Regions:
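Acidic, low-complexity, intrinsically disordered peripheral segments
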Residues: 31-82, 346, 355-377, 423-429, ...
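Regulatory alphaC helix of protein kinase catalytic domains
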Residues: 71, 82-132, 136
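Small/polar, glycine/serine/threonine/aspartate-rich low-complexity segments that form flexible
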Residues: 112-122, 169-233, 363-376, 404-405, ...
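Amphipathic alpha-helical coiled-coil segments
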Residues: 143, 147-157, 267-294, 301-303, ...
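C-terminal motif of bacterial Sec signal peptides marking the signal peptidase cleavage site
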Residues: 26-29
Length: 594
């Protein structure tokens, strides 16, 4: 391929200076280039969200969040040996506390002090939890970045199909012995080109090459030389790699961005449902603690009354032991409930991205979602039409079908058409400037064919993609079946929760009637009767509270599994037409009545 450059020493110096300036400009434009990439990434994300519809949102890339990196980093000497801190057992210390015998009263006082609420705790509502998670949750940020990476991969693939400019400047020094003295020369070569991939395979390119040589020894004659050349080339496949299969990487990258948009939107729905479940569980645990505290108080009252009966000789002494035992069991259960609640709060804070050492107070929230009318046939139809994961699973079958076509195309022979044209300056003129001589125009057209004598690897890939296609079809049908099971389970879950609520309401009423009957005739009831009645009332109240929580979650699960859940950009549930969404908040939701 012809090369050309600048002729005289001044031109060589100018070319060298131009190359240095170009390098500096390239380094200085890195930041602006990254800003352009961020803008284009956001544009792709916006278009994918708009294509998805349904009020979908998209994250916006923020370059300030990421490590900028260094062009020439200086690493520490031990960079290949990261330090590990793992001291032997002899360097560690274990300090045991002395065993102290405590009675029930001292245990109660110490436990109440340990579980006392922090007055400086930050109140956390469900809405504020959602808002905090959207900004700080590692899980949510990872989902956003997964979406961003799909857009970046599309940009990278689209860039491969855009005109790609290149410019290479090289400066060389050459010395050659002439018998009595050395001849020294300085040469500068600049190659400016652009290439473009063709939509149906192959590529075209154009390059402008200049070459200049400056003789540094002018003791006899100056042998300075300069030439230019313009080269146009096209390489077009006619069999393997020809046609629409050439665009498969670009097609797949664009489809992958659509899949990423669906996955992110489905993640937002799942995230809302799971956070709602976590929060309602915390509220349920708070109510369970209130129920446990009430049982401890009632058990202590039964214990005091039984002691009085024993002291008056109206009952056997072992009845007092039974009452004491029940109080201790109630205290132990309350201790376990409080510890389980603290553990749940720490896990909830961790999921929100909040430091676990921060003190928070959960503000009780109760959803007031209307019970939907469930028609199983219609629900399944909605799920098959609207569920984003099913749509992606269906479209993956098309992806694997195209991969089979690409693999089949790769089994063909290579038949390529090469066209090249080289226009250069007059080689008989030492310094030709930027002028071309049509008399020195070279044109080449060549057709080459490579027979497919060895296509074993390609045949294996074809069979592999055919198997993967069948697996994707089965995967789609399995996903449909799994979705149908989930929809049916969600519909039955609503009915199950309604039934459980009705049963537990009657159970609570029966337990309270039992307790009232014992209170009306205390002398006829033993300590066992009283403690059994308290346990039954606590279990009934806990079961009723759990049924209420399960009903609200069952409604949310039904909306999500049928593809009808919609979430605002702020992370809140969007009511469907005909659906009224209400929330009750505040400490008054926790029943602390004696």
């Amino acid at each position: 391929m012809p090369r050309s450059t600048v002729p005289t020493d001044s031109r060589c110096a100018a070319a060298t200076l131009w190359a240095a300036l170009a390098a500096c400009t390239l380094l200085a434009s890195c930041d602006s280039g990254m800003q352009r990439i961020d803008r284009e990434t956001n544009d792709r994300l916006r278009s994918s969200a708009e294509q998805l519809g349904g009020g979908s949102i998209y994250p916006e890339i923020d370059g300030n969040r990421y490590e900028s990196g260094s062009n020439f980093p200086k690493y520490p000497e031990d960079v290949s040996r990261p330090p590990t801190e793992n001291p032997p057992a002899t360097a560690l210390r274990f300090e045991a506390i002395p065993t102290v015998k405590e009675d029930a009263a001292s245990i109660t006082r110490r436990f109440e002090k340990m579980s006392a609420n922090d007055p400086a705790a930050k109140t956390l509502t469900f809405d504020s939890s959602i808002a905090y998670a959207l900004e700080h949750s590692e899980e949510y940020l990872t989902a956003e970045e997964t979406y961003l990476l799909s857009a970046i991969r599309l940009l990278a693939e689209e860039h491969r199909w855009a005109p790609l400019p290149t410019n290479t400047t090289s400066v060389g020094y050459e010395t050659a012995g002439g018998g009595t003295r050395y001849n020294n020369a300085l040469s500068v070569i600049n190659d400016l080109g652009v290439s473009q991939r063709l939509p149906y395979g192959g590529d075209v390119s154009a390059s402008f090459v200049t070459r200049g040589t400056k003789q540094l020894d002018d003791y006899l004659n100056s042998n300075d030389a300069q030439s230019v050349g313009l080269v146009l080339e096209a390489n077009i496949p006619l069999l393997r790699g020809a046609g629409e299969v050439a665009q498969e990487p670009l097609i797949q990258a664009r489809r992958d961005l659509v899949y990423a948009a669906r996955n992110f939107e489905q993640f937002r729905r799942d995230f809302y449902y799971e956070l709602a479940g976590d929060y309602l569980l915390l509220v349920l645990q708070l109510q369970g603690i209130a129920n446990g505290e009430r049982q401890v108080e009632r058990s202590a009252s039964v214990e005091a009354r039984t002691r009085a009966l024993v002291e008056s000789g109206r009952t056997e002494p072992f009845q007092a032991d039974l009452a004491i035992q029940n109080t201790l069991f109630a205290l132990d259960r309350l201790s376990s409930q409080r510890e389980a609640y603290r553990l749940s709060v720490d896990r909830f804070k961790s999921r929100l991205g909040m430091p676990v050492e921060d003190s928070v107070a959960i503000d009780p929230t109760q959803f007031k979602l209307p019970v939907p009318k469930v028609d199983m046939r219609e629900s399944l139809d909605l799920a098959f039409r609207f569920r984003l994961d099913l749509q992606t699973q269906r479209d993956l079958v098309d992806d694997y079908t195209r991969r089979v076509d690409v693999a089949r195309n790769n089994t063909l022979g290579d038949l390529n058409l090469l066209i090249a044209n080289s226009l250069r300056s007059d080689p008989t003129v030492d310094v030709a400037g930027v002028s071309f001589d049509p008399g020195y125009d070279d044109f080449t057209a060549r057709l080459s064919y490579s027979m497919p004598l060895d296509r074993v690897q390609e045949d294996l890939r074809l069979r592999q993609t055919q198997i993967l296609l069948e697996q994707s079809k089965r995967g789609y049908f399995q996903a449909r079946d799994a979705a149908a099971v989930q929809v049916r389970q969600a519909g039955r879950g609503i009915e199950r929760s309604l039934f459980s609520m009705a049963v537990q309401e009657k159970n609570v009423a029966a337990s309270m009637n039992r307790q009232a009957a014992i209170d009306a005739a205390p002398d006829r009831a033993t300590a066992r009767d009283r403690t059994d009645a308290l346990d039954a009332l606590r279990r009934a109240q806990d079961s009723l509270d759990n049924a209420k929580k399960d009903l609200q979650l069952a409604i949310l699960r039904y909306l999500n599994t049928t593809g009808q859940m919609r979430i605002t950009p702020e992370g809140q549930l969007i009511p469907l037409p005909g659906m009224t969404v209400q929330e009750e908040t505040g400490p008054g939701l926790i029943d602390t009545s004696p």
